Design a protein with these regions (language model features):
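Acidic-glycine-rich active-site phosphate/pyrophosphate-binding loop
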Residues: 86-101, 163-164, 179-190, 346
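Short acidic loop-to-helix transition motifs that present clustered carboxylates
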Residues: 57-60, 174, 328-331
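Hydrophobic residues within well-ordered alpha-helices
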Residues: 1-3, 43, 334-339
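Acidic/His- and Gly-rich active-site-bordering loop/insert found
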Residues: 6-108, 129-133, 352
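Fold-level recognition of mixed alpha/beta catalytic cores in primary-metabolism enzymes, strongest
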Residues: 105, 110-111, 115-220, 360-371, ...
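Metal-dependent amide/peptide-bond hydrolase catalytic core
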Residues: 51, 179, 186-385
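Structural motif
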Residues: 73-75, 103-104, 138, 165-168, ...
């Protein structure tokens, strides 16, 4: 599907979210460029300096800045433009039309996370006239978060990120703040053997039996021994899950290849390079391993600014949960690294986490409107306006 036709009405958080839903940015293939440039034009018209950065053709991220003339660095808001595929189940609503039913706005990306982008961009447009001589505001709109945070990794790796004193990641949290998430590491392990007729297995070399030995070793992985820690005071324990297992083509042959994929969720203090080396040592000569996707853990100890974000959320939602971390991973970890590390980061957005990636995904219109006010307060307080 392409872009849906939209009725030209005065810009509002709802209309801006609908406009973004109309761009088909399913990843793969992503093709975020048209959506990125649409947002870039809106921000340029409001006085932002806008730069486009593509890690591949049509895979475009945006960095937009305003202010930033003072010693205090800008505050950064970030969100990803890409969305996940629709899935096999039939939708009852057009996933790109932005249909509403009462308080619900339907569409792929409505919760994850075009509503969050629309909310902080609308807040930025409202405040732009007051930000030109302030510490400033930076908006980072990324491509391909859903497949390994490729856009954020590119921006960080190419040193395209200047300064930020704080980061807000507008992923779906139902307008409740979180202070981090576990890291993500996916690997594929492969073993090789020699095929033979199943009636003469001694003439072959069974790759599946080799893999069984590896799986047994991984299943008994000692995080404390190999990585120096097996628990975080907020996130809890790291996890390792053997996710897929493929071997053999037919029952009457000795399998000459076997593959497994492993999902690991890591906590601060676990170095992914060291973790991979430990796994390779366990695998030894039995097989080989390659990394598929990696995102480092993200965690910020509560400080004065983070407490002020919790204050803002409480003022608009009436809730103040204890500082905790979210289950999914985000661009925040790579962007924090790109800004030099240690930048206090909060995950906060209007979407509902349980609806992300679901058939008939929707977001509360009321929560989008509340998040605009909440984001405006956070931006105002940072910039003293």
């Amino acid at each position: 599907m392409g872009r849906a036709n939209t009725i030209m009405t005065p810009l509002s958080p709802l209309r801006l979210t609908r406009d973004l839903l109309a761009f088909n940015t399913i990843n793969p293939p992503g093709q975020e460029e048209d959506c990125a440039r649409h947002l870039g034009r809106l921000l340029e018209a409001a006085g932002f300096s806008v730069a486009y950065h593509a890690f591949e053709p049509t895979r475009t991220s945006v960095i937009a800045t305003i202010g930033g003339k003072q010693e205090k660095p800008p505050i950064c808001f970030t969100g990803h433009i890409d969305i996940v595929p629709l899935g096999a189940a039939k939708w009852s609503k057009d996933p790109f039309a932005g249909e509403t039913d009462g308080d619900r706005l339907y569409g792929r990306g409505s919760t994850d996370m075009k509503s969050g982008i629309a909310a902080f961009i609308f807040a930025a447009l409202n405040l732009a006239p007051h930000l030109k001589n302030s510490p400033g505001l930076t908006l980072v709109l990324t491509a391909s978060e859903e497949l390994g945070c490729e856009g954020a990794k590119y921006l960080a790796g190419e040193k395209l990120l200047d300064r930020a004193g704080a980061i807000v990641v507008a992923e779906p949290t139902a307008n409740l703040p979180y202070i981090g998430h576990k890291g993500l590491l996916w690997v594929e392990i492969e073993t090789k053997g020699k095929t033979a007729h199943a009636s003469m297995p001694e003439q072959g070399e069974n790759a599946l039996l080799k893999m069984n030995q590896i799986v047994s070793r991984i299943d008994n992985f000692d995080w404390k021994h190999h990585c120096g820690t097996d628990c975080h005071h907020v996130m809890g324990k790291p996890t390792m899950n053997i996710a897929t297992f493929n071997s053999g083509l037919n029952t009457n042959s000795v399998p000459d290849a076997a593959r497994v994929t492993v999902d690991m969720r890591t906590v601060p203090g676990i170095d992914h390079v060291h973790l991979c080396r430990s796994l390779e040592t366990l695998i030894g000569p039995l097989g080989t391993m390659r990394k598929i996707i990696e995102t480092p853990p993200l965690y910020s100890e509560p400080d004065e600014w983070i407490e002020s974000v919790f204050d803002a959320a409480q003022a608009f939602t009436g809730q103040r949960p204890p500082p905790s971390t979210i289950m999914f991973s985000t661009d925040g970890a790579d962007l924090q690294r790109g800004y030099g590390g240690g930048v206090p980061t909060v995950i906060l957005g209007p979407g509902e986490p349980s609806l992300a990636h679901q058939t008939d995904e929707w977001c509360s219109v009321g929560k989008i409107e509340v998040s605009v006010e909440m984001f405006e307060r956070v931006i105002r307080e940072w910039n003293g306006i």
